[in-house]
């Protein structure tokens, strides 16, 4: 569990045979080999740091994370940090600083570009935030630029790289949180819809869309308080909604052509489900529940 921004989230990542995670008790990052399951090894020292939103920069043998550094009688400082993985005790270095808060550091598939969102007091990320993009090398980042939100009138959510290295994100520039594609020079809507393809960013790693393949986005959106799922054909800008009994959905991810999410409804306890491209819904895991007659529930 991460303590960054107090609400935490995205406290682990997996690369090859290793799990990297933030330990709740001391907020240090540990490495755990998944095959041997031996004792986890701390790779960050004891200190004033907290970490979240971990990603692996394999090309440069390091982690990139949001770091929150606490000092007595001072406001905590947030920045993007690198943590070297080729030492027994990793060094923590600032990668990007200056804003009050950071989230969603994300590497392009070729690991040459890094994007992130940032915001500053007094705004919350759903009030006003910026999407930034920079080139990345062993020595750091170069040519950072704001590609969305520079006017202070946008809220950005979940930047995400497509399999073919195009950058997508969610913006509320039209007063609806819609998905956009950055084509290298400007931001274009993937689909214009009077619906919200995002949620307030209370925790790191929140996700409402992912790529089934280079041409298809699996997504969640909310309309009049009810959540829906579907697939967007990027080429034709067509949305295919999925008919299901669920009205509450969150935490979307895709794997091997399927959409996975946590879903529930007023009369259905939340469970992990998967949906294939033929809109077949499968329950993956449902917790044990008490049988309650729906007539006893307020509708």
Task: Please annotate each region the language model reported.
Residues 2-6, 21-30, 45-51, 66-80, ...:
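A flexible loop/linker signature enriched in serine peptidases of the S9 family
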Residues 6-14, 203-212:
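Signature of short aromatic-glycine-proline-rich micro-motifs recurring in repeat-based ectodomains
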Residues 14-16, 57-59, 109-110, 162-164, ...:
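Residue-level detector of Asp-centered blade-edge/turn motifs that repeat once per structural unit
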Residues 18-34, 38-41, 51-56, 60-63:
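Hydrophobic or amphipathic alpha-helical targeting/insertion segments
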Residues 19, 63, 114, 167-168, ...:
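Hydrophobic beta-strand positions that form the internal "hydrophobic ladder"
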Residues 33-37, 84-88, 136-139, 182-185, ...:
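Short loop/turn segments that connect beta-strands within beta-propeller blades
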Residues 39-45, 92-96, 142-148, 187-194, ...:
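Beta-propeller fold detector
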Residues 52, 64-67, 73, 103-104, ...:
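Non-catalytic accessory segments flanking enzyme active sites
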């Amino acid at each position: 569990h991460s303590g960054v921004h107090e609400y935490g989230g995205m406290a682990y990542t997996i690369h090859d045979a290793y799990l990297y995670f933030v330990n709740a008790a001391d907020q240090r990052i540990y490495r755990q080999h998944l095959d041997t399951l031996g004792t986890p090894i701390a790779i960050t020292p004891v200190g004033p740091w907290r970490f979240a939103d971990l990603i692996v920069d394999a090309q440069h043998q390091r982690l990139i994370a949001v770091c929150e550094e606490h000092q007595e009688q001072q406001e905590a400082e947030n920045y993007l940090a690198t943590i070297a993985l080729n030492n027994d005790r990793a060094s923590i270095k600032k990668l990007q600083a200056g804003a009050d808060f950071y989230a969603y550091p994300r590497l392009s598939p070729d690991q040459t570009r890094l994007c992130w969102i940032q915001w500053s007091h007094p705004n919350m990320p759903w009030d006003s935030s910026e999407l930034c993009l920079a080139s990345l090398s062993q020595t750091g980042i170069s040519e950072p630029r704001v590609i969305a939100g520079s006017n202070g009138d946008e809220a950005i959510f979940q930047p995400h790289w497509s399999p073919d290295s195009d950058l997508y994100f969610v913006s509320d520039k039209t007063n609806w949180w819609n998905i956009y594609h950055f084509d290298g020079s400007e931001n274009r809507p993937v689909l214009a819809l009077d619906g919200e393809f995002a949620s307030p960013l209370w925790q790191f790693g929140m996700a409402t869309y992912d790529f089934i393949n280079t041409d298809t986005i699996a997504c969640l959106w909310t309309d009049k308080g009810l959540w829906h799922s579907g697939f967007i054909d990027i080429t034709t800008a067509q949305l295919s909604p999925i008919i299901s009994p669920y009205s509450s959905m969150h935490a979307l991810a895709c794997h091997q052509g399927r959409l996975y999410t946590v879903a529930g409804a007023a009369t259905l306890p939340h469970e992990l489900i998967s949906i294939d491209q033929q809109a077949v819904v499968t329950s993956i895991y449902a917790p044990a529940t008490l049988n309650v007659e729906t007539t006893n529930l307020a509708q």
